[in-house]
A protein has these predicted regions:
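Rhodanese-like catalytic fold shared by cysteine-dependent sulfurtransferases
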Residues: 1-18, 26-167
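N-terminal glycine-rich beta->alpha transition that marks the start or flank
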Residues: 22
Length: 167
């Protein structure tokens, strides 16, 4: 899987019909996303449904207390069991896709002092897609994610109303 910068992502979208896919929770995508992008959530907000998820949420907040005051509207996330289904429903299976999240992660860039890379949701989503048979040749990873998307000239940021969960 090739890692590319946002400027190259835009070129591939415009000239070679690659599709930009945001893997952040839908609530984040609705607030701000690279335009145009589709949303397939790799993680979803963690809902307190029972004692197990309550314990998980409490432990997470003890480790990451800054999330209590986060503007995201949720304190923690859990893996989306329907991630692959969302990819299929969006008509993306087998298409040429560029995945991103908020910060992008790094794939083993020695010059950036990350010998083994930095794991982020977009990289985890890529791993999941490849493991499930989505051809690696049809996937690119956008380094720096949304954080650098609006730093490049002529890039657009979009927002949308949040869709009800389950749609």
């Amino acid at each position: 899987v090739e890692q590319i910068m946002p400027k190259r992502a835009k070129e591939l979208m415009q000239n070679e019909n690659w599709i930009l896919v945001d893997v952040r929770p839908q609530i984040d995508w609705c607030r701000k996303h690279a335009y145009p992008s589709k949303n397939c959530q790799y993680f979803i907000p963690l809902e307190v449904r029972d004692l197990r998820t309550f314990t998980k949420q409490a432990a997470s907040l003890a480790i990451f207390p800054e999330r209590v005051f986060s503007s995201s509207g949720y304190a923690n996330v859990e893996e989306n069991e329907n991630f692959i289904e969302e990819v299929v429903e969006e008509g993306l299976w087998g298409e040429k896709v560029i995945l991103y999240d908020d910060v992008g992660g790094v794939i083993g860039e020695e010059m950036m002092d990350f010998q083994d890379g930095v794991q982020t949701p977009s990289l985890m989503a890529i791993h999941e897609l490849v493991a499930r048979g989505f051809g690696a040749e049809n996937i690119k990873h956008m380094a720096a994610g949304l954080e650098w998307w609006d730093e490049v000239e002529d890039f657009e940021i979009g927002s949308a109303e949040q869709m009800p969960m389950g749609m």
